[in-house]
Amino acid sequence: AEQFALLEAAYPGRIDLGIGRAPGTDPVTAWALRHGGGGVEEDAAARFPEAVATIAAMLSPAGVGLRLASGTHVLRATPNATSVPDLWLLGSSDYSARLAARKGLPYVFAHHFSGRGTAQALALYRDEYQPSPAYPEPQTFLTVNVVVAPTLEEAQRLALPNLASMVALRTGQPLQAQQLVDEVEEDDLTHATGVLARQMRDRWVVGTPESAAAELRSLATMFGVDEVMVHPVAGAVRGTPIDRAPAREQTLRLLSAALA
């Protein structure tokens, strides 16, 4: 809350704060975070709605009141909030859609994660939406994995490292440093993991600037969302500087020109 309050003070009206209950990692690490040594309490996920309300209150000028033995204390993310960042609830299930609707918050569906259940979750959110003072109408956007290159063949090659990482995550393998395009090509995916990789890639936007722009517009229209968030996932090749991501920069540059 403090970090986003600072960003909002520096760039008022330009900051979005997304809150989700998933830790964004493999099942073993997720268990360790929630239950293992030093992790949060077992009921932390169940208390997620309370956490959302607390963060929203801390960002507001009024703050959140905490009752202690010494009296009621007010916590604020910043001493003098003149504006607050837009709060978006993140999710990939009916649970998150219902919670966002109940709290009258904008909703982000993690379409990049599985690509399944998108229409159902968004319809549920809109049907059950309860207007709030800050957000009288439902607001939605999708997240999409995108790789764009001058040719389809190059885009497909650049997608390989992230696909391999996602296959490892889905099949319970330990997470490691992402491979280079050349390394994935040399390793070659087995038949089983190759099928899984192709299924995931089919839900991504991988192609030329023109085809990618058309596909993103089609997704936005199909699901009736207000915005689409592009997640550039193009990998690196041998010789790429470790502090740069030229293939991801290329994705954004080419896509921006095609959408202009």
Each model region followed by its residue ranges:
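An alpha-helical appendage that flanks or caps ligand/catalytic pockets
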Residues: 38-76, 117-226
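Flexible, glycine-rich active-site loops centered on histidine and acidic residues
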Residues: 1-63, 107, 115
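Active-site beta-loop-alpha junctions enriched in small/polar residues
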Residues: 20-24, 92, 112, 143-147, ...
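Structural preference for beta-strand elements that scaffold enzyme active sites
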Residues: 14-18, 86-88, 106-108, 139-141, ...
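Long, low-complexity C-terminal extensions of enzymes
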Residues: 208-260
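Glycine-enriched alpha-helix->loop->beta-strand junction motifs that scaffold or abut catalytic
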Residues: 11, 101-108, 163, 224
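A conserved active-site cap/scaffold subdomain adjacent to cofactor or substrate pockets
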Residues: 93-116, 121-122
